[in-house]
Amino acid sequence: MSPKTPASKGRTRGRNAGRGVGSASHSASGGRSTAQQHRQWLGLVDTEGPFLSVPVLTDLYPQGIPGMSRERREVLRAAKPALDRAWDTWDADRDSEATLTSYRHARDAWVDTVLTEVLGWDGLWTTAQDRPVLAETYRAASDGIQAVTVTPTGALMRGEEVGALVLVTDPADSLREVGQDGWATSPIDRVAAMLRAPGSTCSIGVVTDGRWWAMVSAPREGSAASGVVDCQTWVEEPATREAFCELLSVRRLVGGTAAHRLPRLFEDSVLAAEEVTE
């Protein structure tokens, strides 16, 4: 089930494919400090740029990342096998349009389940098809006469507030791979470009091909950062699953106070790193 080439470069470990959804038990963390727990799951994320820092995470989650509810784990357990089968079929015959079409159907169902039922975006998840203004506002394009244009698949929205953009892509070995459509950028780069569109009011994005999931931070001022996780490792590494789902929950994107939302966590992480450097 492993792809033919590594998913991404750098720090990612635990890439062996899993086939279900494990429990939310944190018994393995016994005897370790909260900072060590955060450091461990961060070490399993393929990060690039100024990603979330251990001090900031420890301050917000002094007891560690909260576990996922049993109901949400059951939703994942029921939905994941269909995605696994579709990926395997596509991976065995990558040049077939039929297998790609079949994979897209399975991917879309899986992504919808993760966003609405696992992350809890139900009622707030809005597609660009339903809200054309998303495509108009967050459009990004390459330079040149024959420009390649990309728009978000949808977004988490509360009223007119955009909490996170979402881009769903075709299957690939890595979300950091440069596209083959004439624009020499990766899906992650394209999300960053959309987040920095002239009319953007959002700095957080999510990009996925179904298997790989990336969290992207791209403030208008400052460096972009991203972290990629493999949903196949959500079995043997539930801590990364729970951290990913908690950080992309409604309360971290459009709920609570701004000081406890994901954009501020990225901002504070940059400041913390600068203080250490000084």
Provide a role label for each language-model segment:
Residues 97-134:
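Acidic-basic catalytic patches of nuclease active cores, encompassing PD-(D/E)XK
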